[in-house]
Structure formats: C-alpha cells, structure tokens
C-alpha cells in the first residue's frame, strides 16, 4: 500500500522497487495518494497498482477521506480518516474490491451503499425517460 507522506513510498516507488522484486500485488489507497503521488495522477497510480494483480482476481483498493475536511477543523491531521465517505469512488471503469477505512465502520458502509443506490436510481430514471 502506498504511503500518506510525500517523503515515503508512492505507488510508483512500490511498483518500481518492491513489486518487481517480490511479485506481491499492490493495494492502492486513494486517500494516501493525495499526499504522495510519485508524479502520477490518481488514475495512473490506480491502473499501475491494478496491473500487478492476476486477471482473474479483482484488485483491492482502500477508500477513505480526510477527517480534517469532514470536520472542517484544520487542527486535525489531513491524513486522519473521516467517519464516513461523502464523495463517490472514481473507479475509472475498473472493477475493484473496495475496503473502506472509516471511523464509523459498518455504518459508513451502509451510508455509502444507500448513496450509491440512490445515485444509481437517479441515473436509471434519467436514462429511461
């Protein structure tokens, strides 16, 4: 998994320096990527990490958001995890197994599921008109 500090391991660093030595798949962390890009866009880093997984296995990704932004409190570390996920997860057309990293655990999952279901229903209604 990529780190959440610019001075540490980006997805590209892990791919170049560890994956080629070990063959162990990379887990992409969306939240960490915001702090340690390694010069890659989110999509590029996600695709690079996904390329390390066998084609018959869905890549695992970690999804979380900043607690400081959620709470509107600049005193909280930006890397700290929020209670819930507010924004839709951008998959760039790929399938992943998503692991949520939220303080509210199962409640966060249920809330995100409701948001996705509602969004899907809205899209369905617009396209069926």
Spans of features found by a protein language model:
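C-terminal accessory extensions appended to soluble enzyme cores
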Residues: 64-69, 74-129
């Amino acid at each position: 998994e990529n780190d959440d500090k610019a001075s540490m391991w980006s997805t590209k660093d892990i791919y170049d320096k560890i994956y080629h030595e070990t063959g162990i798949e990379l887990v992409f962390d969306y939240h960490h990527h915001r702090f340690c890009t390694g010069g890659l866009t989110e999509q590029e880093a996600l695709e690079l990490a996904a390329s390390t997984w066998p084609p018959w296995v869905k890549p695992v990704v970690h999804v979380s958001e900043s607690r400081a932004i959620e709470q509107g409190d600049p005193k909280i570390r930006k890397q700290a995890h929020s209670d819930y996920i507010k924004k839709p997860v951008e998959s760039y057309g790929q399938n992943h197994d998503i692991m949520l990293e939220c303080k509210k655990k199962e409640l966060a999952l249920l809330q995100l599921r409701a948001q996705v279901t509602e969004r899907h229903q809205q899209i369905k209604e617009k396209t069926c008109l």
